[in-house]
Amino acid sequence: LALVPSLSLAVLGLLSFGVFMGAIDVVVNIHAILVEQAAGKRMMSGMHAFWSVGGFAGAGLFSLWTATFGLTPLQSTCIAAGIIVTLILIIHRYLLPYGGGDGGALIAIPRGIVIVVGIVAFISFLSEGAIMDWSGIFLTEVHHFDLSLAGMGFSLFSGAMLIMRFFGDVTVHHLGQKLVVLGGSVLSVLGFLAIIFGEAAILLYAGFFIIGIGVANIIPVFFSLLGKQNVMPISLAVSAVGTFGYLGILAGPAVIGFLAHATNLYAAFAFLAALTALQGILAAFVYRKMGV
C-alpha cells in the first residue's frame, strides 16, 4: 500500500489486506477458545484487550515514526512488518497445531443459537462502527465542540473498552458472564441516553465512557460461549459470528448516516440505544436457551 501508484491498485491492496486480516481474526479467536478450554479458566477478555493494545500501538507508533522522526510511510511500514515477523518467529512454536472441529465448509452458514449470537455481534460491532465515525460529528456539529475535541468521544469509548477488557476475566469470574453481558447492555443504554439528553461536556464524555464499559466484554464472553455450543463446529461458528460482526461495523456508519439525514443525530443515537436494549434481550435468550 505504501508503494501503489494508482487508486485501483490501492483498492485491490486494501481488499486483499482485509481478506487476510479477516481470516486471521477468525483463526486467532478459534485459537483463543481452544486455549481457554485447555486452561480451564477465563482468558478471552484479556486476549481481546491485547488486540486493542495492538490497535493503539499500531496507530500511535506509525504517527510517531512519521510525524516525530520524519520517516516515510514505506519506512514505517517496513519497521512495522519487521516487528510483526519477529514476534511471529518467536511465538509460532507455542501455537496450537489443530483447529476447532472438523468443519471444512467453504461458507460458514450459521444455524440455531449461533444465529442469535451472530445478531448480538452484529449489533455490538454496528454500535462501535457508528461511534467511531459519528461521535466526532455529533460533538462538533450538534454540540459545537472545537474540532480539536472531535476525537474525545471515541477516545474515551476505546479507552474504557481497553481498561474493562483487561479486568474482564476477573469481573466475569466474580460476577458471572450473564450479569456482565446483561449489565453491560443496561450500562450501554444508559450511556446512549446520557449522550442523547446530556448538554454538559462532562455528561457527554461520561456517556461515551459508559458505553465503552458496557460493551467491552460482550463480544469476548460470547466468543467463549461459542466453545460451549454443539450446533456447529467451533471453527464454523466463530467464522459465522465474525462475519455478522464485520457486517455490523460496515453497516453502522451507513445506517447512522441514513437516519441522521432523514431525521437528526439524536434520533440516530436513539436507534442505537434501542438496538443495544434488543442486544440485551437476545443475550438473555441465548443464556436461557443454552442453560448457562
Please identify what each model-predicted range represents:
Residues 22-37, 217-230:
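Intracellular juxtamembrane helix-capping segments at the cytosolic ends
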Residues 74-92, 269-285:
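Symmetry-related core transmembrane helices of the 12-TM Major Facilitator Superfamily/SLC fold
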Residues 8-24, 203-216:
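Hydrophobic core of transmembrane alpha-helices in multi-pass small-molecule transporters
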Residues 66, 164-176, 260:
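Helix-to-loop junctions at the C-terminal end of transmembrane segments
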Residues 133-149:
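Short amphipathic helix-loop junctions that connect adjacent transmembrane helices
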Residues 147-155, 235-239:
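Small-residue hotspots at the loop-to-helix junctions and early N-terminal turns
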Residues 15-16, 111-127, 209-213:
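Pair of pore-lining "gating" transmembrane helices in MFS-fold secondary transporters
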Residues 1-5, 187-199:
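C-terminal ends and interior cores of transmembrane alpha-helices
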